[in-house]
Structures are given as structure tokens and as C-alpha cells.
Amino acid sequence: MGFQPPAALLLRLFLLQGILRLLWGDLAFIPPFIRMSGPAVSASLVGDTEGVTVSLAVLQDEAGILPIPTCGVLNNETEDWSVTVIPGAKVLEVTVRWKRGLDWCSSNETDSFSESPCILQTLLVSASHNSSCSAHLLIQVEIYANSSLTHNASENVTVIPNQVYQPLGPCPCNLTAGACDVRCCCDQECSSNLTTLFRRSCFTGVFGGDVNPPFDQLCSAGTTTRGVPDWFPFLCVQSPLANTPFLGYFYHGAVSPKQDSSFEVYVDTDAKDFADFGYKQGDPIMTVKKAYFTIPQVSLAGQCMQNAPVAFLHNFDVKCVTNLELYQERDGIINAKIKNVALGGIVTPKVIYEEATDLDKFITNTETPLNNGSTPRIVNVEEHYIFKWNNNTISEINVKIFRAEINAHQKGIMTQRFVVKFLSYNSGNEEELSGNPGYQLGKPVRALNINRMNNVTTLHLWQSAGRGLCTSATFKPILFGENVLSGCLLEVGINENCTQLRENAVERLDSLIQATHVAMRGNSDYADLSDGWLEIIRVDAPDPGADPLASSVNGMCLDIPAHLSIRILISDAGAVEGITQQEILGVETRFSSVNWQYQCGLTCEHKADLLPISASVQFIKIPAQLPHPLTRFQINYTEYDCNRNEVCWPQLLYPWTQYYQGELHSQCVAKGLLLLLFLTLALFLSNPWTRICKAYS
């Protein structure tokens, strides 16, 4: 709908005036013109707004004559309109509002969806200073009866059927919106002329629009289908067509009636106390202050959560990377008191502090500022928690914290380690079993060193850190069943003593195997050497003092031990409750030597060269018993080999043999007799048998 000529002329003048006033820095409305289709509009009055008054007038441009704006008279209300002014910083927010409400339109209009507007007026908002007009805002009001969201919507809401019981798409081949799909005869967008072109080639079945066809298992389908078997009347299904197996075949329920899911329910932020009746596996551990006992943990997304609750009987070993500039020490656990209602008291953690020796293992990319006057700060690099549990309670908590002293302004990346273990209260030590009785995959190989007082140990490999030097490498245990290769670098100078280099290499390699015996089983007793403990076989142990070739040439050493090969023989040793138990039959270590020569560039500078040394672990599985050799029949007639064919005829009666241990033998016999009865009935009801009976009768 266009404006009348006077209003259009006034609009052009106001637009030109507003642009010029903005350039001159005078009062101006932004925007100078508004088309209003709702109950309220707002504009900004910018410039020198001190002492400015705002007035509102309804323009009646009948007979092509517009009234002269009355400035200086405060008039912010009319019979149907009101204007409010909210002051701001060198700006006034001017809001014009319709006072009657849009319900007035629906009460006066019989057709709420009429094409003609309900309100059609022109408003003029004027800003005056010292009784003189300074700026104008022209508002063209054009409001329809159904233009507001507050209008009552029609009750004819489209009901989306539940696709579990009714197909949402009655025409699955209708793939293109607003166009006719060829060969889709159920497409409503196809005209009759187009449908005649491919009526004989329409899609059939569910895709063609027959979304509720009678499926083959219906009893009614057997009466119209030829060649149905004789047993069909006994096993057919009596079901209405509405219960079809094609429901959701093409539409998988992307739109369905909304149901409140569990994660949308209001979540109480207060900690739930699970300790009143004892802990269950997975329950968070509570403190006496009704709060969770938290230790930093790593989420599934890889982020480190500082306030993650500790779950009962859940062990974990995580590492968190933190920027030292953003690091904040957690509240000390010395004051933490764990709730233990079942024992009628409180469990206080026993904390032991140790100083970290090598900071290069924990802090990388370090940058220490020259600020000697600042006091150092203490950071925790490792925290080990041992929880002793008894039934559903916690009886003891032992904590060992490794801390380091760094500069207060030191920068870098710190890697923290947090270990939590739950042990039974009657366990004599903190060592865990690696299986019961056989080893479990991924558990540490248990070892003993009878030459030491504290003889409990394990076999290790290197875990490099930083530059990969052996001086900064840490140890990690050898896990059962995992073949691993690890190594580190030795710094060697051009004037290195070969004998001392061999001693250093042998010492580094021997540090991985600080044991004399390994456990044959995962539950071998550390206190009883005869309880399945095997002595480690050491082959070709080098003599560091022997120099095979005395040479005065610098930068060359022969027969340097550089590789340690650890071979572990394992085998299956029976089964417990159907689970195969594996044990260790022997462990052998063997050294390999290399000839080292200093690598020079253009010139041999006095810089340290790097000698790589490595260690490998190989688990070799051998059969507990030698397999029986194949017979000539098994070699020639492979169709009876169950390992080469999908159908295994020799195992047809396997459930009734003594080798089947899935259930009791008596149950297998009973089920077999029942199956034989069904086969006999099927034989009597079959078509050949009925013919024989008719022939005799």
C-alpha cells in the first residue's frame, strides 16, 4: 500500500533533514522514518538532548492537507497512542506504543485474516528545544489483525502421527518437493497427463505407496498365494494389516511425539549422599561436609576436570597437562575427612610427602625469569591414593604426594599424574594380583629379586620423555601379552672411554630387569618361592671390562651392548568357568652388541653424540600339548574339515556329546528328545505321508 502524495513528500523532507542534521551534529532521529506493523516501535534521538521535549501527533491528511506540527507543547499521549522517553548518554530512546492492544482488532473484525489493515495511520513525533522544532520522526502504521504473535492461533494444529504405529510417509517414492517424480504414481504433485505417461511402469510395493501390504507371514496371505508349504497353517500369524513389519522402513522416526527424557529433568546441584547405607560400586565418595571427594581426572573428550568425584572401587591412572602460569594448587587433602557411617566414624587420609628428583620428567618448555628476590612455590607433580575397603565401607586412605619446588614466576607446561587404587582391607601389601590363577592380558608381569630385602618387583621398559635421553626416561611395567619395543639415547663424547661406555650401557639395560624370578601364574605367592616361580635365564651376558680390540683411535668402540631382547614363553593351562587361563613357562634375556663410531660433520667438534639403546619384549605362545598329526583322510577330503567349511557335519550331534559343557547333559538329552518328537509330528503331517494314508484307506 503506497503513501498519499503529501505523506510521501513529507517523508522525503524528513529523510533529507535527518541526514543533514547528522552531518551538522544537530538533533536527529535515527531512523527518521519507521514502518510500524506491531504494537510498539522505538527510535533513537541523538545530538544535544539537554532540555529537549518530545511530542506526538496523529496526522490527518484528508483532502491532501497536513497539519502543522505543534512544537514546544509537551504532548506525549493521544487517545490511542503513547510515547515514552528513556534518557541515556547523549541519546534518548523514544518508544511509541499502541494503547488499546491488538485484541481490539479481533473484536472489530469479523474476519481475523482480512486482507485490509486493521490500523492505518500516520504518526509524527517531534523533538523541540526552546519552543522550536529540532527533529521529526515519521511513523507509518499498518497493522493487520493477524500480525501479532499474541493473536490466538487456530486450533487446527497439524497432528504428526507416531511412526511406531503409523507410517508418516504414505508415498515413499515422492522424493522431490514441488515437482513430479517419474514412476511415482502416488505423488500428488503429478498431474493426470504426466501420470498417463508412466502409469504402466509405476513403482510397486512399499516404495510405490503400498505402505501396508499383507506380509508373507499372514494367514490370509496363504489363501491367495500358490505353493505355500504344508506347515504354513500351523505357523502363520493372525494380525491386522495396521500392525505391519514395514512401519518405519523408510522413515526411522526423525519426527515423533516429544517425551521427557532423563537428561532434560531438573538436576539438583547439591551432592547426593550415598554413604548413609554404605557405598556401592560407582558411587561417589562423600566427605563429612556433604561434598564429593574430588581428584583431577580426564574426561572422554581428553580434557582434565579438576573437580571430578572419585567413584567407589574405580581405579584410574591419569595425567593432566597444566600451564604453570594458570596453575592453582588444590585445597590440601590433609583436612579432608571421608564419611564412613557404617563404621560410625570418620576416615582421615594419611599423607606422605616426597620430593621429586628430576623436574624434566614433569615440566617442559621451561622459562625461568631472572627474579631472585621472589619466594619459590611448591607444586604437586604426582599424587598416589590407596583406598582400603571392607564390604561397602572405606577403612583407610593412604596418600603419597611427590612435590617440587619451582620459581614463583617460572613458565612452562607441567604434567601431573594422579593414581587411585582400591585394595581390600585384609591385603597384606599394596601389590595387586595379575590374575587368578592365570595371567590376565594387560596386567603386569610379577617378579621377585631374592638378592634384596624388599624383593617384590616387576619387569620394566623405558618410557622416554623430553629429548628421549636415558637420564630423563621413566620406567613402565611390562604387561602380559603385549609385545613392546622401547628405547632411549645415551650421550657419548668423541673421547669416550669404551670400557666405561660398555659399563654404562649394561647398567642401563640391567636396570630394566632388576629381578631373578618371574611368577608362573598371576597369583603366585611372593613369600613362597616354590609357588610357581621361574628363574630368569640370562644368555650372553656381556663382560663390560673385556676390550675385544684395544685401539687408540678416538670416537670408535666395538661390541657395545645396545639391545636387550626379552622373550617370554606362555601357554594355555586349562580353563576356569569357561575362561582360558594362561601362564608363563619361561623368561629369557639376551644382549645384542653394536659397533659405535662418532659421527662427524664437516669437522669433528667436541659435541656429544647420541647412542640409541633399546629393549624389546616378545610373548611367544606355544601349545600346551603337541597337536595330533592330520590323517590321510583329513588331508585328502577337506569337505569334512570344520575349519575350512561353514557346514560341519562331524559336529552335527555335538550338543549330545561329552565335549559340550554349555549346560547339563540331562537337559541336552531332554531337549533332543523333544526335538525328535517335533520332527516325528512334522513327518506324519507332511504331504507324502498323507498320500500314503489315503492310498491305504
Curated annotation (Swiss-Prot):
Main subcellular location of this protein, as a coarse class: membrane
Alphabetical UniProt keywords: Cell projection, Ciliopathy, Cilium biogenesis/degradation, Cytoplasm, Cytoskeleton, Glycoprotein, Joubert syndrome, Meckel syndrome, Membrane, Signal, Transmembrane, Transmembrane helix
Biological processes, Gene Ontology terms: cilium assembly; protein localization to ciliary transition zone; smoothened signaling pathway
Record's signal peptide: 1-25
Membrane topology, record value: Single-pass type I membrane protein
Localization, UniProt: Membrane; Cytoplasm, Cytoskeleton, Cilium basal body
GO cellular-component term (any): cytoskeleton
Pfam families membership: TCTN_DUF1619 (PF07773)
Domain of life assignment: Eukaryota
Cytoplasmic face of the membrane: 690-697
Glycoprotein is among the record's keywords: yes
Quaternary state and interactors: Part of the tectonic-like complex (also named B9 complex).
Database matches in PANTHER family: TECTONIC FAMILY MEMBER, TECTONIC-2
Family statement drawn from the similarity comment of this UniProt entry: Belongs to the tectonic family.
Name used for this protein in its record: Tectonic-2
